[in-house]
UniProtKB/Swiss-Prot annotation:
Transmembrane segments: none annotated. Pfam families: LANC_like. It is a peripheral membrane protein. It comes from the Eukaryota. This is Glutathione S-transferase LANCL1. One of its GO terms (cellular component) is cytoplasm. Keywords: Cell membrane, Cytoplasm, Membrane, Metal-binding, Transferase, Zinc. It catalyses: RX + glutathione = an S-substituted glutathione + a halide anion + H(+); 1-chloro-2,4-dinitrobenzene + glutathione = 2,4-dinitrophenyl-S-glutathione + chloride + H(+). Functions as a glutathione transferase. Catalyzes conjugation of the glutathione (GSH) to artificial substrates 1-chloro-2,4-dinitrobenzene (CDNB) and p-nitrophenyl acetate. Binds glutathione. PANTHER family: GLUTATHIONE S-TRANSFERASE LANCL1, LANC-LIKE PROTEIN. It comes from Danio rerio (Zebrafish). It is found in: Cytoplasm; Cell membrane.
Length: 405
């Protein structure tokens, strides 16, 4: 049943450096020929994207399906290629986003924090420091309501506290300085921890998992709405005040997620769901893998890496999705799992597999995949595929956008 959601992987698997010699060298640098073919495909897809965006929703400000996501793509292209016209495009699109903020959601991907954070970085690169500071001030004005959890704010990435947390981390990483004071970040993490403890105790599972989170009364597991996405951030160095709490609260909660693994190596969308169906970044191995790799980095337990490697096998076998080529539930998003494994292991097999998924993406539209609701957006559509292809040009620096830190 699960196989029906993916197309059969037509690529031969990695057998040694010989099969990858046209793709990259022993240091993981792409060959000039392969890099040139990726760059030309990016240019080709950008022309299609720009034309398609003429019919996009003018009021969608978000990173997920709207203008902020397109702005982030161009900001990324500016980082990779250094072309100032990309930065100007980022400014054009982020200004559209700022004109139509939700006034409701507070996250990077689906709310107002993303447009404000992206705008602050774009303005900063353009030396427009007053405008940049204004966006940062507006971003920080949201912080008290996020800590307090106003409006029954959830904790997950797309609509909750973690999504606001990422916005603050994004700013500090892009500015390469502590532009957002660290106590603001730790206060968010404290609130996330407290919320997780309350639900765990309410559900009487604190002995199994000291933390628990839900979204619309469901205990989601994946990166977008669930436990693995939240724990990935709570294990980042220094975000949680007091390393003892990472060991006493986060580690056993991570272990609880590990116990939910299917025999295949995949993970359910929700606690208690026995169907091994989804191999997406949002639900399944391609999102859980980041939690596992971070747990291995922090706790040094080999089993976390073994589980992450098993996620890689699931992605290789079932990751070329009929849903298309996007980030959230598509081939590009799934390919980032290989890049994460490559960065932690330096095993060229994982870079090779990412290159094969890139080849699939470079044949965009030729596999009979479904057309997304927002076919040119960052998380559902073509913009996300372009973002991935640009990231593959420098694999050691690649990060899943709006998520990986």
């Amino acid at each position: 049943m699960s196989e029906q959601r993916a197309l059969k992987n037509p690529y031969p698997d990695y057998t040694g450096l010989g099969c990858a010699q046209d793709l990259f060298d022993m240091q993981g640098n792409l060959t000039q020929h392969f890099a040139t073919s990726i760059s030309s495909k990016i240019s080709e897809l950008l022309a299609i994207l720009e034309n398609g965006l003429k019919n996009a929703d003018p009021r969608d400000c978000t990173g997920y399906t709207g203008w902020a996501g397109i702005a982030l793509l161009y900001l990324h292209l500016h980082s990779v290629f250094g072309d100032p016209t990309f930065l100007q495009r980022a400014l054009d699109y982020v200004n559209r986003s700022l004109r139509s903020l939700t006034q409701r959601w507070v996250t990077f991907l689906c709310g107002d924090a993303g447009p404000l954070a992206i705008a602050a970085v774009v303005y900063h690169r353009l030396q427009k420091h007053q405008e940049s500071d204004e966006c940062l001030n507006r971003l920080l004005q949201l912080q008290p309501s996020v800590v307090q959890g106003k409006g029954r704010l959830p904790d997950e990435l797309l609509y909750g506290r973690t999504g606001y947390l990422y916005s603050l981390i994004f700013v500090n990483q892009q500015f390469q300085q502590e532009k957002i004071p660290f106590q603001y970040i730790q206060q968010i993490c404290d609130a996330i921890l407290e919320s997780g403890q309350i639900l765990s105790q309410r559900n009487k599972i604190q002995d199994q998992s000291p933390l628990m989170y839900e979204w619309y009364q469901e205990e989601y597991v994946g990166a977008a709405h669930g436990l693995s996405g939240i724990y990935y951030y709570l294990m980042q160095p220094g975000l949680v005040a007091g390393q003892d709490r990472v060991f006493s609260l986060v580690k056993p909660s991570v272990n609880y997620v590990c116990q939910l693994k299917f025999p295949s190596g995949n993970y359910a969308p929700c606690v208690g769901d026995a169907r091994d169906l989804l191999v997406h970044w949002c639900h399944g191995s391609p999102g859980v893998i980041y939690m596992l790799i971070q747990a291995f980095k922090v706790f040094g337990v080999r089993q976390y890496l073994e589980d992450a490697l098993q996620c890689g096998e699931v992605i290789w076998q079932r990751g070329l999705l009929k849903k298309g080529y996007g980030l959230c539930h598509g081939a590009a998003g799934n390919a980032y799992g290989f890049l994460a494994l490559y960065k932690i292991t330096q095993d060229p097999k994982h870079l090779y597999r990412a290159c094969m998924f890139a080849d699939w993406c470079m044949n965009y539209g030729r596999h009979g995949c479904r057309t997304p609701d927002t076919p040119f957006s960052l998380f559902e559509g073509m913009a996300g595929t372009i973002y991935f292809l640009a990231d593959l040009l420098q694999p050691a620096r690649a990060k899943f956008p709006c998520f990986e830190v």
